[in-house]
From Swiss-Prot:
It is found in: Cytoplasm. L-serine binds at residues 233-235, 287, 387. It catalyses: tRNA(Ser) + L-serine + ATP = L-seryl-tRNA(Ser) + AMP + diphosphate + H(+); tRNA(Sec) + L-serine + ATP = L-seryl-tRNA(Sec) + AMP + diphosphate + H(+). The lineage of its organism: Bacteria, Bacillati, Bacillota, Clostridia, Eubacteriales. Its EC number is 6.1.1.11. This is Serine--tRNA ligase. Catalyzes the attachment of serine to tRNA(Ser). Is also able to aminoacylate tRNA(Sec) with serine, to form the misacylated tRNA L-seryl-tRNA(Sec), which will be further converted into selenocysteinyl-tRNA(Sec). It comes from Clostridium perfringens (strain 13 / Type A). Pathway: Aminoacyl-tRNA biosynthesis; selenocysteinyl-tRNA(Sec) biosynthesis; L-seryl-tRNA(Sec) from L-serine and tRNA(Sec): step 1/1.
Length: 425
């Protein structure tokens, strides 16, 4: 959520910044919310004047009674003032609802470093690590490797649940679990994160706090009989752990790493991404979430990207980093980087992590603040999160990049102690 004061004082600047944002968003609603806010503020001024008048009249009543005067008219005036205040309070409540409705649907303001552009083709590559894997044979896609090696069962996943659900079997299940443990160990032992194992279901306030609601409700899995939502990412429960709290400034930054299953109703509809593990309704991920002071947040974003990189480097998987343009930025981020792993079957890089700085956008929605001393006025924290990284896509990348001509797959060195083997065959 944006700062309403900033909308009032920098209206045209904000409208310009939000143009070409890539969201289905009409910047003219900013004028609407400012008009509603002006109406609300005028009524609040009237209410204060009425309350002052009521206090003055109220003070007259005991004086008149003491003097033996009739207070009938004064009491009637008191009731009339009270009715006006009650009516104005109702108008303010109605305006608050209208303002909040709009404010929850206004996307974040892009950082000036965000490139101009409309689609992912306009994202700017800023780094590559490793070289795309070359083969002296025709490589297989991960879905064929997973089936041939009896690691993945797409047919039974479909039978049990439906399309885009997968059963991991035998060494495939062990590979998934080994990657999870490797990522968590890397982030907690080496990168300084505190591990969290969060709930996989959250309430509406939590989904609103991180920005999934109200805009993306149709993309979420909702438990109809009680109003819970299955989490699309551990970002939601971990960020909302601190909702409506004021944190101690000297404890910042707070850094959490969380493994969870993730659930996405909208999983894509066309192209090769619909095959295999790339777009699933249920998948596993290790998420990195940070809470920090505003002056720390962009340095912490750089570190967050490096932490996500570290697990891919540890696995020897080639990747690149792109800075996301305005039109591809999404609803909540002020600045975002995608890390894309090389996928031979696609002959291109495929997103495996997104690392974002939300500045105070989520903190305002979730009311997460900090202060440096007990007497200091609380300020909103900045929140950041990044995939550290997606597990299923890592499985796919390992199968494709480490495959051998005979159809076997070499286990990356970093996973051998977890897998207790050197080769999948």
């Amino acid at each position: 959520m944006l700062d309403l004061k900033k909308l009032r004082s920098n209206t045209e600047e904000v409208k310009k910044a939000l143009s070409n944002r890539g969201e289905d968003f009409d910047v003219n609603v900013i004028d609407e919310v400012i008009a509603l806010d002006e109406e609300r503020r005028k009524i609040l001024v009237d209410v204060e004047a009425l309350k002052k008048q009521r206090n003055e009249v109220s003070a007259e009543i005991p004086k008149r009674k003491k003097a033996g005067e009739d207070v009938t008219e004064v009491m009637a005036e008191m009731r009339e003032i009270g009715d006006k205040i009650k009516a104005d309070d109702a108008k303010v409540a109605e305006l608050n609802d209208k303002i909040n409705y709009i404010m929850l649907r206004i996307p974040n303001i892009p950082n000036p470093a965000v490139p101009e552009g409309e689609t992912d083709e306009d994202n700017v590559e800023i780094k590559r690590w490793g070289e795309p894997t070359k083969f002296n044979f025709e490589p297989k896609a991960h879905w064929d490797l997973g089936t041939d090696l009896d690691l993945l069962d797409f047919e039974r996943g479909g039978k049990v649940a439906g399309s885009r659900f997968t059963v991991y079997k035998g060494m495939g299940a062990r590979l998934e679990r080994s990657i999870i443990n490797y990522f968590l160990d890397k982030h907690t032992f080496e990168n300084g994160y505190t591990e969290v194992l969060p709930p996989y279901m959250v309430n509406r306030d939590s989904m609103t706090g991180t920005g999934q609601l109200p805009k993306f409700e149709e993309d979420a899995f909702k438990v109809e009989n009680n109003g819970y939502f299955l989490i699309p990412t551990a970002e939601v429960p971990v960020t909302n752990m601190y909702r409506n709290e004021t944190l101690e400034g000297d404890k910042l930054p707070i850094k959490h790493a969380a493994y969870s299953a993730c659930f996405r109703a909208e999983a894509g509809s066309a192209g090769r991404d619909t095959r295999g593990l790339i777009r699933q309704h249920q998948f596993n991920k290790v998420e990195l979430v940070k809470f920090c002071k505003p002056e720390q947040s962009y340095e912490e974003l750089d570190k967050l990207v490096q932490d996500a990189e570290s697990v891919l480097q540890g696995l020897g998987l080639p990747y690149r980093i792109v800075r996301i343009c305005k039109g591809d930025l999404g609803f909540t981020a002020a600045l975002k980087y995608d890390i894309e792993v090389w996928m031979p079957s696609y002959n291109r890089y495929v997103e495996i992590s997104s690392c974002s700085n939300f500045e105070d956008f989520q903190a305002r929605r979730a009311n997460i603040k900090y202060k440096n001393s007990p007497k200091e006025k609380p300020q909103f924290v900045h929140t950041l999160n990044g995939s550290g990284v997606a597990i299923g896509r890592t499985v796919a990348a390992i199968l494709e990049n480490y495959q051998q001509e005979d159809g076997s797959v070499v286990i990356p060195e970093a996973l051998k102690e977890y897998m207790r083997c050197d080769l999948l065959k």
